[in-house]
């Protein structure tokens, strides 16, 4: 076995074994592509009079199409995960699931739970397929389990990087979208209409509202009713909405969608009650008036 090159440098196998022995490594877990190297390493360890670590060779991680994963493929660069807003615990959770069977229906684990459950015996023999969408789903589950303060703190840098303001009630704003986002990088787009008054309207949503002949008069009546409420709360606003619909001989549902689009510019998002509370009376009335102008222009 050649251990030293003609230029005096040592080959990988020699350096690898020396490193493991010096650091008293007890377990070496590596890809199955290193399987052919193990006999050489065992020979070197024996020659050094050292104690061999326990070797385990696990299946390679493949792309969805079955090709070998390379550093240029999606999900291969570790630095991409924090930039996209993956939580460290979620990434560890997902990587553990790639090629390992927990023997249960559970898929979401904390690092401590993984330490308690993981065993090499549970690693599958067949190569695993890497699924970045599954990783995002795991991240969503971990976000949902976070407390509000921790989520707001984690999301804040992404919102600031997007050039959006951070209002005093940002923690409450973050809480309203906590179960709506998969990645922290999605938070800015989810909260932009809550932290600033200039935002884009979804074209399809606006077209749908325009198709409702009662939308403009109903929204105008609602703005007038909101402006004279004795006190402002989501419940009071919803009661006013029901009264306006009843007075106009319409169903409450006919007003809910136009109201959401008027306040947020989009067809989906946080709970309408959260939007009403977070925006407050003045901003809600202003947005209703602005949207009725858009519908009639």
Label the predicted regions.
Residues 148-248:
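Small-residue-rich helix-loop
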Residues 95, 138-139, 174-181, 256-263, ...:
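Short alpha-helical scaffolding segments that buttress acidic/His motifs in well-ordered protein cores
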Residues 20, 41, 66, 91, ...:
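Residue-level signal for inorganic ion chemistry
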Residues 1-57, 62-69, 77, 102:
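Active-site cores that bind ATP or allylic diphosphates and position pyrophosphate for catalysis
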Residues 73, 77-162:
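A conserved active-site cap/scaffold subdomain adjacent to cofactor or substrate pockets
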Residues 81-89, 125-131, 165-173, 246-254, ...:
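Structural motif
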Residues 235-295:
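Charged substrate- and nucleic-acid-binding regions of tRNA-handling and nucleotidyl-transfer enzymes
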Residues 23, 99-104, 144-148, 185, ...:
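Short helix-capping/linker segments at secondary-structure and domain boundaries
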């Amino acid at each position: 076995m050649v251990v030293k090159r003609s230029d005096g440098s040592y080959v990988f196998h020699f350096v690898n074994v020396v490193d493991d022995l010096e650091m008293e490594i007890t377990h070496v877990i590596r890809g199955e592509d290193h399987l052919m190297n193990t006999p050489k390493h065992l020979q070197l360890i024996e020659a050094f009079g050292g104690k061999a670590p326990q070797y385990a060779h696990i299946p390679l991680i493949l792309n969805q199409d079955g090709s070998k994963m390379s550093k240029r493929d999606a999900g291969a660069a570790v630095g991409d995960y924090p930039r996209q807003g993956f939580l460290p615990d979620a990434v560890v959770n997902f990587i553990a699931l790639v090629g390992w069977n927990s023997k249960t229906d559970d898929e979401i684990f904390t690092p401590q739970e993984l330490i308690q459950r993981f065993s090499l015996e549970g690693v599958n023999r067949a190569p695993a397929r890497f699924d970045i969408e599954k990783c995002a789903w795991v991240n969503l589950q971990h976000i949902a389990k976070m407390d509000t303060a921790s989520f707001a703190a984690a999301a804040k840098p992404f919102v600031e990087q997007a050039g959006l303001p951070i209002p005093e009630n940002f923690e409450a704003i973050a809480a309203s979208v906590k179960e709506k986002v998969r990645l922290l990088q999605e938070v800015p787009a989810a909260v932009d209409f809550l932290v600033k008054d200039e935002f884009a309207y979804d074209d399809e949503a606006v077209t749908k509202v325009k198709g409702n002949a009662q939308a403009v008069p109903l929204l105008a009546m609602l703005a007038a009713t909101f402006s004279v409420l004795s006190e402002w709360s989501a419940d009071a606003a919803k009661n006013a909405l029901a009264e306006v619909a009843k007075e106009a001989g319409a169903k409450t549902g006919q007003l809910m969608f136009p109201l959401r689009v008027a306040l947020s510019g989009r067809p989906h998002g946080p709970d309408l009650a959260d939007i009403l509370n977070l925006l407050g009376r003045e901003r809600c009335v202003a947005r209703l008036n602005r949207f009725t102008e858009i519908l009639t222009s």
